[in-house]
Amino acid sequence: MDFQHWLHEAVNQLRDSDSPRRDAEILLEYVTGKGRTYIMAFGETPLTDVQQQQLADLLQRRKQGEPIAYLTGLREFWSLPLFVSPATLIPRPDTECLVEQALARLPVKTCRILDLGTGTGAIALALACERPDCEVTAVDRMPDAVALAIRNAEHLAIRNVRILQSCWFSALSGQQFDMIVSNPPYIDAQDPHLSEGDVRFEPRSALVADENGMADLTHIIDNARQMLTPGGFLLLEHGWQQGEAVRAVFRRSGYSDVETCRDYGGNERVTCGRFTP
């Protein structure tokens, strides 16, 4: 079987996927080591028996709903190729909105940034890449996530980031930052979307929070003040229906300049506030 015929068959088998053609192409690129342009130009290239078996196994797993990123171990975020694993969330395009808003608020001078619950390191590494003059600290409570974020930093040769194991602020006593960012768990445990799509395979501890999904958001907002320098910013990603509640917690905790920004789909996604003692 050649590239072209396998793609045709795979697209048909993945017809219930949101993106059957792209899914099939990614799997073929991953197994053959060939880029999309090569595959399109040389569709008559035969697959080896080993490649056909690998593709059959991956195709079956994808048909059962396993995310492409977990099948290949790779995901692009902010144009950075990242290693991913089932120990962490898969970086999503909407989270790039958090990076955009953070960059827009960073001062021109060198500053210190903290990323809470870093997972793959996506947010921290994007900020560190864009602002090599800044010192970025990234923390996660899960050892596997810390190891993965370190691997990504080393692979990308990003030097201005340090990655630590910490449950939110627990290992950061006495330290201060000019900006704190986070994409914490914010989904309610009873949300029916937890049984749909990619999230079925992602770690629930990185998705679900108590108090209707607000517990971790509230904890960060209430405790970030003591870690921020005067005038420093806190930016949080949250659910599309949580904007009003998150703004209320920011204001209750004494932050100024509180505002919510929308994601690429037009939904309220990132809320920020400024620490003004």
UniProtKB/Swiss-Prot annotation:
Instruction: Please give the Gene Ontology molecular function terms for this protein.
Output: nucleic acid binding; protein-(glutamine-N5) methyltransferase activity; protein-glutamine N-methyltransferase activity
Broad enzyme group: transferase
**Entry keywords, A to Z:** Methyltransferase, S-adenosyl-L-methionine, Transferase
Reactions listed under catalytic activity:
L-glutaminyl-[peptide chain release factor] + S-adenosyl-L-methionine = N(5)-methyl-L-glutaminyl-[peptide chain release factor] + S-adenosyl-L-homocysteine + H(+)
Q: Which Pfam families match?
A: Methyltransf_31, PrmC_N
- Give coiled-coil spans as residue ranges: none
Example GO biological process term?
A: methylation
Query: Which amino acids does the record list as binding S-adenosyl-L-methionine?
Result: 117-121, 140, 168, 183
Query: Could you say which residues bind substrate here?
Result: 183-186
**PANTHER family annotated for this entry?**
HEMK METHYLTRANSFERASE, MTRF1L RELEASE FACTOR GLUTAMINE METHYLTRANSFERASE
Family per similarity comment: Belongs to the protein N5-glutamine methyltransferase family. PrmC subfamily.
Q: Please give the name of this protein.
A: Release factor glutamine methyltransferase
